[in-house]
Regions:
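Histone-fold and other basic nucleic-acid-binding segments
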Residues: 1-212
Length: 212
């Protein structure tokens, strides 16, 4: 079940909208990102969300729960594949910690902090979280966790955008490209998470090129 839940995000046709990612990138980096870069950032963020939701759904099912609860997210984040990635070292201290708390108040606080940090007044990713839970976890989410996981997606977009912007700056590029995003993913993720995100990016860009 876990393998099917972790199917390609491109095949599932679920990912952050390119326009939403573009807005975040411009506000975070003050650099222009081409369409391929925005698609790549969206796919990387979605790959992380799918993995987190799928692992949390597995935890919920093992406990016989009908919904994903905060401690299911906490256990998922504490798994080895997450803890080995630099992205999760940062996120645990910022967005993900709120989802591993025991109260809805903590989850909302994490979501609010991530929104403010990203300079985005309204988190645009709530509907994405709900669709992802249906498509990959098939387990209901509590309302506070929808908020917190939306903050998680925003944090993923923020970190990938920031790191891709740094890669662009090092090469004196004025535009963030998909290659800069791949560099960011390589820096932020490790092991299967990295491989999954890079594969999703590659598949999405091939599909985009075929549609043009």
């Amino acid at each position: 079940m876990a393998n099917s839940a972790l199917a390609s995000t491109s095949q599932a046709q679920v990912r952050p909208a390119v326009s939403q990612v573009k807005q975040v990138v411009q506000e975070r980096t003050r650099r222009r990102a081409d369409k391929a870069a925005c698609i790549a950032i969206a796919e990387a963020a979605q790959a992380l969300l799918v993995t987190l939701v799928s692992r949390a759904a597995d935890e919920a099912r093992r406990g016989g729960a009908a919904r994903i609860l905060p401690w299911h997210i906490g256990r998922a984040v504490q798994s080895a594949e997450f803890r080995s990635s630099p992205f999760f070292t940062k996120t645990t201290a910022r967005a993900a910690d709120g989802t591993s708390g025991s109260t809805a108040k903590e989850a909302r606080r994490a979501a609010r902090a991530a929104r403010l940090d990203g300079h985005v007044k309204v988190n645009p990713f709530r509907s994405l979280v709900k669709r992802t839970a249906r498509a990959h976890g098939n387990v209901a989410l509590t309302a506070p966790l929808v908020v917190a996981l939306s903050a998680f997606v925003l944090e993923a977009v923020n970190q990938v955008a920031d790191t891709a912007g740094e890669a662009a700056a090092k090469s004196d590029a004025t535009t963030i490209t998909a290659d800069h995003v791949r560099t960011a993913v390589t820096d932020l993720l490790a092991g299967d998470l990295q491989a999954r995100a890079l594969a999703a990016i590659g598949a999405a860009l091939v599909a985009e090129a075929a549609d043009e």
